[in-house]
Amino acid sequence: MRNTFIVCWQYLRAFALIYLCLLAGNAVSALLPFTIPGSIIGMLVLFTLLASQILPAQWVKPGCHLLIRHMALLFVPIGVGVMNYYDLVSQQFGPIVVSCLISTFIVMLVVGFSTQIMQRERAMAGDRTPPKDNE
């Protein structure tokens, strides 16, 4: 029984923290003079809290694992909602496909170059050979 309460508390805490970051992102988004979705700002707030270790990752991990496990199910309402605009989507199908292909290619380039740079830096940091004297 006690274990059940602990697990429920962990899930409740995780979802509350994720939701508080979303609310903070929405509040910041409403104050900005330009448009950035509040959910994006909320994710950045959550990332900042986790990266600076202000918020322990263990506190949000149960909720994140549950959301990731059921992520495909969460996209069903979006897919159904897009079908309300089938005429518009079918008219703009070409530009949508082109933008998806171009953005995919750009992401692949950025990831490739970033990986090469990180591997190069890791190889230099891992090189523990003493410097050679030029005599």
From Swiss-Prot:
Subcellular localization(s) per the UniProt record: Cell inner membrane
Pfam family, one: LrgA
Record flagged with keyword Transmembrane helix: yes
Membrane-crossing segments per the record: 5-25, 30-50, 63-83, 93-113
Membrane topology type: Multi-pass membrane protein
Main location as per UniProt: membrane
A GO CC annotation given for this chain: plasma membrane
Keywords: Cell inner membrane, Cell membrane, Membrane, Transmembrane, Transmembrane helix
Family: Belongs to the UPF0299 family.
Protein name: UPF0299 membrane protein PC1_1498
Organism, as annotated: Pectobacterium carotovorum subsp. carotovorum (strain PC1)
Lineage: Bacteria, Pseudomonadati, Pseudomonadota, Gammaproteobacteria, Enterobacterales
